């Protein structure tokens, strides 16, 4: 028994716009180039960029011409990034769809231009509820669908939505399941769902007889799902670092939901969860995967190849090959990893971002990635030689202390500029020159963002009209828009009088989704939709 669905007519909050205004909003969306948002932060590089936004410009994003269009209400907190599908063939005609999931184990498709409910589905089986918060306030009061889904949409198809849902039987048993939903109907596909289970050779936490066992009660799927080469990859975080737990990555064949590969990155140790403030695993064009592992055991005894002899990679920047199954092929570990692990100043609170190939002053091309965590340092690694573990850090570049307050978020990238939102700090804009970061930010916002900082998204029309968007975790939540070059504020949702653009309470790790002239932002009760006012 999979998702149970029903269709519905228009459902909007009291702040929804009038029917005529909805029609006016719909018209431009159908007349411009249509862009899907199918995965966390727009693409597998996780750069947060929609470079084909032709409607929103530096000139029209202001409180006089831009604002809230409608809100949609769901049955739980929205922790995952909303996704967007254009021109889906539904029972009521061709529609642009906004895909939203909740911590109450529900998935929704709304008309992305009007807010009308197209379908709603539940992941719960008879006798089940969403998981309780496991005594941990990180995701509370219930745990259902936490991570951002991923959508597979081959040409001329409606698309398949892959998501992970956590639930609990009245008997007390916990389940994690992978679902595949028809984007047009919400109906289950590929004989789904499948219960998620795994084992891996090792003697670490929750092992028996030389095998580590995945216990679904001990984990939550925080990391956005990754789809490459017909495989959906999942990565697992713990509940408040409550042992026993280890670092799991799993792959499932997208077309069958059969498990095809499993890797544990702390199999003979403990901890090493994958958080990333909800960031998805990152992948390059050769299907290598990159991520930042959290505090956990690192085996500093290295083998002849320079890798931990026991295969334990706590608090590391990791590269995995997917050819023939998951395997660690490169890594970077801080020289002071033991101290960072003990003081909980690990890398795991941030996500990894892949940069486009860059040319240095000598004409050499570099394939780079960036990452940062709780220690306030900004790390740039060479993806073809990340640095390993040494008595001093030997990665490509380190900006020590560049991110005061630490990172519990994901950066964004556009046109040789890198944008980070540290805790309690402004959004900082760093510039690359000759394949190196300049040592100090070239711009920053006036606004500082309280915990967990900000994860920016960027819209642009090619190299023009670039706008940095960010959501503020406050009550009410605030959507901000900044000129991407200067970080001068263009708009925020508190500017209009009478609370015109307020859209609900904020939530941590929220990421604005920009598609076809609209901006969608999650809250504790639903999603606010913004665009040009009628």
Identify what each model region corresponds to.
Residues 35-359, 364-389, 407-430, 453-460, ...:
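Mobile, glycine-rich extracellular loop/lid and propeptide segments
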Residues 390-403, 441-446:
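Inter-blade linker and blade-boundary elements of WD-repeat/beta-propeller domains
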Residues 1-12:
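N-terminal secretory signal peptides that target proteins for export/translocation
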Residues 494-498:
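Contiguous ligand/interfacial binding patches
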């Amino acid at each position: 028994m999979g998702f149970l669905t029903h269709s519905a007519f228009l459902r909007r909050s009291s702040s929804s716009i009038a029917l005529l205004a909805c029609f006016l909003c719909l018209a431009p969306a159908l007349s411009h180039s249509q862009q899907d948002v199918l995965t966390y932060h727009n693409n597998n590089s996780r750069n947060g960029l929609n470079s084909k936004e032709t409607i929103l410009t530096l000139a029209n994003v202001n409180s006089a011409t831009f604002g809230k269009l409608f809100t949609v209400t769901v049955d739980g907190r929205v922790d995952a990034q909303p996704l967007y599908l254009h021109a889906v063939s539904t029972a009521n005609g061709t529609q642009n769809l906004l895909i939203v999931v909740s911590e109450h184990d529900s998935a929704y498709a709304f008309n992305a231009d009007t807010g009308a409910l197209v379908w709603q589905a539940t992941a719960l089986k008879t006798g089940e509820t969403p998981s309780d918060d496991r005594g941990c306030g990180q995701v509370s009061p219930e745990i259902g669908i936490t991570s951002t889904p991923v959508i597979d949409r081959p040409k001329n198809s409606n698309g398949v939505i892959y998501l992970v849902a956590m639930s609990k039987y009245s008997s007390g048993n916990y389940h994690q399941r992978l679902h595949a939903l028809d984007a047009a109907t919400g109906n289950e596909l590929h004989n789904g769902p499948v219960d998620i289970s795994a084992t891996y050779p090792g003697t670490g936490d929750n092992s028996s007889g030389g095998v580590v066992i995945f216990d679904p009660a001990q984990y939550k799927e925080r990391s956005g799902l990754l789809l490459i080469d017909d495989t959906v990859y999942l990565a697992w975080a713990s509940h408040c670092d409550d042992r026993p737990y280890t670092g799991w990555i799993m792959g499932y064949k997208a077309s069958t939901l059969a498990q095809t590969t499993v890797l544990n990155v702390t199999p003979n140790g403990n901890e090493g969860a994958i958080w990333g403030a909800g960031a998805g695993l990152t992948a390059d064009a050769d299907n290598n995967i990159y991520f930042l592992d959290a505090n956990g055991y690192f085996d500093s005894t290295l083998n002849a190849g320079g890798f931990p002899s026991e295969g334990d990679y706590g608090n590391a920047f990791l590269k995995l090959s997917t050819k023939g199954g998951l395997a660690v092929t490169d890594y970077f570990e801080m020289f002071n990893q033991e101290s960072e692990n003990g003081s909980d100043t690990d890398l795991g609170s941030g996500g990894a971002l892949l940069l486009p190939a860059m040319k240095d002053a000598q004409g050499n091309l570099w394939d780079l990635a960036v990452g940062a965590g709780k220690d306030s340092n900004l790390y740039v690694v060479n993806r073809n030689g990340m640095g390993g573990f040494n008595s001093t850090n030997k990665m490509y570049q380190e900006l020590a202390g560049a991110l005061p307050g630490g990172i519990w978020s994901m950066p964004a990238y556009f046109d040789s500029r890198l944008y980070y939102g540290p805790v309690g700090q402004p959004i900082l804009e760093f510039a690359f020159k000759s394949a190196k970061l300049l040592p100090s930010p070239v711009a920053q916002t006036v606004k500082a963002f309280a915990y967990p900082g900000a994860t920016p998204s960027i819209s642009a029309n090619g190299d023009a009209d670039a706008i940095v968007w960010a959501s503020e975790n406050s009550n009410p939540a605030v959507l901000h828009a900044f000129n991407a070059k200067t970080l001068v504020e263009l708009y925020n949702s508190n500017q209009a009088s009478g609370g015109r653009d307020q859209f609900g309470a904020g939530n941590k790790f929220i990421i604005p989704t920009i598609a076809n002239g609209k901006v969608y932002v999650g809250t504790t009760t639903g999603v606010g939709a913004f665009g040009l006012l009628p």
